[in-house]
Amino acid sequence: MSKDKIIIYQVLPRLFGNKKSNNKSKGSIIENGSGKFNYFTNRALSEIKKMGYSHVWYTGVIAHASQTDYTSHGIPKQYPEIIKGIAGSPYAIRDYYDVDPDLAIKVENRMKEFENLVTRTHKNGMNVIIDFVPNHVARDYKSIMKPSDVSEFGANDNTSHSFSPTNNFYYISDRELDMSLIPVNHEDVAYSEKPAKATGNDCFTHQPSKFDWYETVKLNYGVDYQNRYETHFNPTPDTWIKMESILLFWAEKKVDGFRCDMAEMVPLEFWEWVIPRIKEKFPKILFIAEIYNKDAYRNFLNKGAFDFLYDKVGLYDVVRDVACGYRPSSDITFTLNEVGDIQNHMLNFLENHDEQRIASDYFLGDPQKGIASMILSACVNTNPIMVYSGQELGEEGMNEEGFSGKDGRTTIFDYWSLDKISRWDNNGKWDETLLTNEEKEIRNFYTSLLNLCNQESAIRKGKFYDLMSANYENSEFNSAKKYAFLRGDEKSLLLIVVNFNDAESVVNVNIPDDAYSFFQKEKKKNGLASPLLKFKNPTVSFSDTNALYLNIDAFSGEIFKITFE
């Protein structure tokens, strides 16, 4: 486990550095263009590193189903009716052993271009995370790049059985796939599947709907879902063995971590088996679980051997509600307590490819209003924090790109470019020349905050002390709209205060004597609270009354270093 605080930059290479700005709804790669591995130049990567990031999660690296025709390069043509969007979903994998040809300057050199990206990322002082999608594959999965000693998924399946411990897929016996509920031109439907396979979201019917993950099929890990969830893990299921080979393949490419898509839809026993086997050969490699079931958290850490878990249904949901005014900020204490013993294993974020942008009309409508939430999420513990590319510039996600409608999210299904990223790119200069003052301001905030997360040892490795209980009855605090806590270690003590109110506030924060004892700090008569983010606040003097009077902007916050004269 890293001694530094892990700070992840999630980026969809298809969008990053895209040189075309046509942005035609449902446009092709010819019309709208695509980002490339090579667009992550040393200059671009050094700028990402300067913002404080330790890891880059390159989203959508592994080859996935797409409507773009690469048959001239020996890549099988896909069926449009089983693909979401023109570019396709990065989570409908068509070949686990290949990379997305959209991302290559020269398609025939696509793997080498990815390997060079890994090398460049490492040379710029950052680690590489990619997706591992274990639960499902594209309906028309066909690997052309697999090693010769690896058999194809489903090649040895007995398709007359809806379930068999030795099968890679689940089947709907004697039924043909029926796409009539999917919104496509059914006169042009050419894809056929008999017997039909179960769809990726545990849909065991031959007739998936438009609300199902109809572009994917579920993989069989030895669980008979339609027979009381009976498990068949001995002998080791063939799917397990295939997946171990895939993980080793990418680990050998010097990838430093895997973000495991929908990890809880795969049996815990598989993770318990495979992660230690991978870590035996690659002990520093990270495994991050996309997981939404709080009751499973500890098992996925203690048995499943994951390093980190998504904190979506905990901190993200609560902080979002607080920022939007739907619940009091005091609720943050309760959600932190729920994962108190494992909080250092939770991955915090305010945006990712699944969630709505802070600046969208569906969230806060203004990136500045996300500052309080970001300070809290980044500084509340030693655990990782993640930022989604464009978040640091105030990307709104309010385009109607094609398959992805105007929903406050940046598309993962369509060819597109992001104006703010394109202007930061500035023809490969990766500077602020073309950014607006507002974009520069929010970017500078993220840069300052994320760098502080590792510059200040109290944030990087220190302990946490919640100040809310000491301020519930404080009439000058307002525990429904403010949140305050301490972070400290043997070197320093930090006071962090955030304001979720829509107005600037003068806040009186009580720090009890017990807090100083908790951090083994000697409290003296005269103290100073020096702002590190410097949002208008001068250094504040305080005495042994335990109270600090602080001025906090609307939807903002500050980190104060506490010292004594």
Q: What spans do the regions from the language model cover?
A:
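N-terminal structural segment of carbohydrate-active enzymes
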Residues: M1-N127, N135-V137, K142-K146, V150-S160, ...
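Alpha-amylase-like alpha-glycosidases and glucanotransferases acting on alpha-linked glucans and related
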Residues: S2-I8, L12, A92-I93, D98-T119, ...
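Loop/helix patches that line or flank the sugar-binding groove of alpha-linked glycan CAZymes
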Residues: K3, K19, S66, E81-I82, ...
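Short, flexible loop/turn elements at secondary-structure junctions
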Residues: P13-L15, I62, D100-L103, P134-H136, ...
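Short catalytic/ligand-binding loop motif for oxyanion handling, primarily in non-cytosolic enzymes
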Residues: G17-K20, H64-Y70, H136-S143, V266-F270, ...
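Extracytoplasmic/secreted proteins, especially bacterial periplasmic and envelope-associated proteins
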Residues: Y39, R43, E113-N116, K242-S245, ...
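Short beta-strand segments at enzyme active-site cores
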Residues: H55-G60, V128-F132, R259-C260, V387-G390
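C-terminal beta-sandwich/jelly-roll accessory domains of carbohydrate-active enzymes
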Residues: N501-E565
